[in-house]
């Protein structure tokens, strides 16, 4: 019931702004490296915020603490590898690590076929993607653990076409050597780093502090160049022209978060925390035309912005009985471009009909302060153009009402069926000739 920009996708708690390869044909997530996933189609608790649709937090494997091991997989279009093991003995610190990587190789296969057919010099397959992830855990002592997590993934499209022509006219004694080159470089992807400190303050209180950087960049660079030299009799000369077009969108997201979990009251699990998120947006377009003695530079699009979101949340899970549980919470938010504070109440209920079957209800309000500038009628979404919510636009929000049932099978498979109602306000969409158009409902 939501658009892609209204859903928060995370890896180890870090926001992933472009969670797919090749427009969604391939997932960003390497399934071999996944430990578990926390998914909420709606009605998610107060500890999550920033989106008004759904939440998916993919948690990577911790790594094997006992022995070194690995596996590799080869398919028709890609290869992937995963290795993991305990920290080296010389570190004198218990812990584990995991490294996983993946790359498509149909570009290499197709190029090899083209070379064998004699066409490889003129034509090459232009696209591939790759990604890798690293996770390191260090148990400094029984009460303190540090976790470093990194993800790096790119889609790459490269096109290179060049030619070299010679012309000679014996009657006019004219000779010309002409070279032309056309090149497209188009990388886009996500790069993330995070460091998490978990502190077991006492048996009833756990603190978690998290610092992360998530960077998404899309960069389309096209260059066309022609140059040459000529001779007619005793006269000689040179020439050269170049045209370049550069289109880019860069998001730099820095997040600081702390969370406390307290189990000091019977039948209650209390959580509270704060989050500071600073996001820099840079959307731009540049043209350049040059010849031997003149350069013309145009910059028709240059949108730079910085926003800061500050959030406080608290939630309590109350086990009223062996069959009934409530989850009540709220999230208070400040958006740097707006003067007012926003409060999102959250409520959840779970009733156990029997040991393997439960009924769930969730209600809540959810605010969002960023959007995308993609056309509504876009059929294939390869990349997204993210923008912060302008100061003159009201905050977007949605009210959720979710009712569902869950069934846990004997093999620990969880089946869920839900019906939902989501009411959206102040939506912003891109229309022909306008950057932003507000939809009130």
Question: Model-found features: residue ranges?
Answer:
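Outer-membrane beta-barrel channels and translocator barrels
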Residues: 4, 34, 65, 77, ...
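Predominantly transmembrane beta-strands of Gram-negative outer membrane beta-barrel pores used
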Residues: 8, 36-45, 53-61, 68-139, ...
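Short acidic/polar hinge/loop motifs at secondary-structure boundaries
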Residues: 14-40
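Transmembrane beta-strands of outer-membrane beta-barrel pores
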Residues: 43, 60, 74-78, 87, ...
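Outer-membrane beta-barrel signature, preferentially recognizing the C-terminal barrel domain
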Residues: 178-197, 301-305, 366-424, 434-435, ...
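Face-selective signature of the C-terminal outer-membrane beta-barrel domain
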Residues: 137-156, 183-338, 413-416
């Amino acid at each position: 019931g939501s658009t892609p920009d209204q859903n928060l996708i995370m890896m180890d708690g870090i926001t992933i702004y472009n969670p797919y390869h090749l427009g969604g044909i391939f997932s960003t997530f390497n399934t071999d490296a996944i430990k578990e996933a926390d998914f909420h189609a709606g009605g998610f608790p107060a500890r999550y915020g920033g989106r008004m649709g759904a939440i998916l937090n993919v948690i990577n494997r911790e790594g094997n603490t006992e022995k070194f091991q690995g596996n590799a997989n080869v398919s028709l279009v890609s290869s992937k590898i995963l290795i993991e093991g305990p920290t080296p003995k010389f570190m004198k610190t218990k812990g584990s690590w995991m490294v996983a990587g993946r790359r498509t190789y149909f570009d290499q296969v197709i190029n090899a076929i083209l070379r064998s057919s004699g066409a490889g010099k003129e034509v090459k397959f232009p696209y591939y993607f790759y990604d890798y992830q690293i996770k390191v855990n260090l148990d400094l002592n029984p009460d303190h653990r540090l976790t470093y997590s990194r993800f790096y993934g790119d889609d790459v499209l490269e096109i290179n076409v060049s030619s070299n022509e010679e012309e000679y006219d014996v009657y006019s004694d004219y000779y010309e050597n002409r070279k032309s080159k056309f090149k497209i470089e188009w990388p886009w992807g996500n790069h993330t780093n995070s460091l998490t400190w978990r502190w077991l303050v006492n048996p009833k209180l756990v603190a978690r502090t998290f610092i992360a950087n998530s960077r998404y960049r899309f960069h389309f660079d096209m260059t066309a160049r022609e140059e040459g030299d000529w001779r007619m009799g005793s006269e000689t000369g040179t020439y050269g022209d170049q045209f370049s077009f550069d289109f880019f969108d860069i998001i730099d997201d820095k997040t600081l978060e702390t969370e406390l979990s307290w189990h000091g009251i019977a039948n209650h699990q209390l959580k509270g925390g704060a989050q500071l998120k600073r996001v820099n947006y840079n959307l731009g377009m540049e043209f350049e035309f040059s010849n031997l003695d003149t350069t013309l530079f145009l910059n028709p699009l240059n949108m730079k912005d910085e926003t800061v979101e500050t959030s406080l949340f608290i939630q309590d899970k109350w086990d009223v009985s062996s069959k009934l549980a409530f989850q009540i919470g709220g999230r208070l938010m400040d958006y740097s471009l707006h003067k007012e504070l926003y409060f999102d109440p959250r409520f959840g209920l779970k009733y156990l009909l029997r040991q393997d079957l439960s009924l769930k209800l969730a209600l809540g309000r959810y605010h969002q302060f960023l959007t995308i500038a993609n056309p509504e009628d876009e059929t294939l979404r390869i990349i997204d153009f993210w923008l912060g919510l302008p100061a003159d636009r009201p905050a977007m929000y949605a009210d959720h009402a979710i009712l569902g049932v869950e069934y846990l099978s004997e093999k620990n498979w969880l089946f869920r069926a839900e019906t939902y109602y989501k009411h959206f306000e102040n939506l912003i969409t891109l229309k022909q000739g306008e950057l932003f158009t507000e939809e009130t409902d």
